[in-house]
């Protein structure tokens, strides 16, 4: 359908019927010029989602001008954006990061500040967090507000008045909680975590044993700064196995 003589609106509607993974597969069959015509049609947010299914998105990002590329990066999860940027030359990296909004730029620089073998280099800042003083109703409202930006919502993290990690709540427990229930009654204060400067090799088995969708990453002062998802973990294990058999 990418090469069909449809109007821009008709083509966009047709493409929307397909999953982003399928669109990514189709992208690889198109020429550079064909993709360049599609990027403005799809928009930065959609392109960012499609890029998450492409093995080497940095190659496709370089088909965009700097302004377009920065917009796409701003819609990517921070850890994915870092992976893409790390494949670019230093000058291009610096220009793109400088064009991002303050929050995206901060998150990317923070992740890039860690050594490759440290937990912090794997984390994403895409997670939902609420304060332990909220009521059930307030917590649900806050979660709905954050859900538009963060899609890792199966686990909701809780911090105290000093912004230190307090625990976690399963989204299901929050949804079914009666309005009069105290937030403290459904928070798991023994929820596992890792610290940002821990070595990945030292804690990978421990994280696997937890069997959680995501694990919070804390600083030495117990400040919640990110999470490691199960998908991140799978990729690390796969990479390690690939090196072992190389």
Provide a role label for each language-model segment.
Residues 1-245:
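Hydrophobic packing positions in regular secondary-structure scaffolds
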């Amino acid at each position: 359908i990418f090469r069909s003589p449809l109007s821009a609106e008709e083509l966009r509607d047709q493409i929307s019927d397909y999953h982003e993974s399928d669109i990514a597969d189709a992208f690889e069959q198109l020429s550079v010029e064909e993709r360049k015509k599609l990027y403005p049609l799809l928009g930065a947010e959609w392109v960012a989602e499609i890029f998450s299914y492409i093995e080497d998105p940095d190659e496709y990002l370089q088909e965009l001008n700097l302004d377009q590329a920065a917009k796409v990066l701003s819609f990517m999860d921070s850890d994915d954006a870092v992976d893409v940027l790390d494949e670019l030359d230093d000058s291009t990296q610096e220009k793109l990061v400088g064009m991002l909004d303050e929050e995206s730029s901060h998150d990317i620089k923070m992740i890039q500040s860690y050594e490759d073998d440290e937990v912090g280099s794997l984390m994403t800042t895409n997670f939902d967090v609420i304060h332990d003083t909220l009521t059930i109703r307030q917590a649900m409202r806050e979660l709905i507000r954050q859900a538009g930006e963060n899609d890792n919502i199966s686990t909701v993290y809780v911090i105290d008045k000093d912004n230190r990690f307090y625990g976690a709540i399963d989204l299901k427990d929050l949804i079914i909680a009666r309005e009069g229930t105290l937030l403290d009654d459904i928070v798991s204060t023994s929820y596992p975590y890792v610290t940002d400067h821990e070595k990945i090799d030292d804690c990978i088995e421990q994280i696997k044993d937890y069997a959680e969708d995501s694990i919070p990453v804390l600083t030495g002062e117990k400040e919640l700064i990110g999470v490691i998802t199960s998908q991140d973990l799978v990729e690390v294990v796969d990479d390690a196995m690939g090196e072992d058999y190389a």
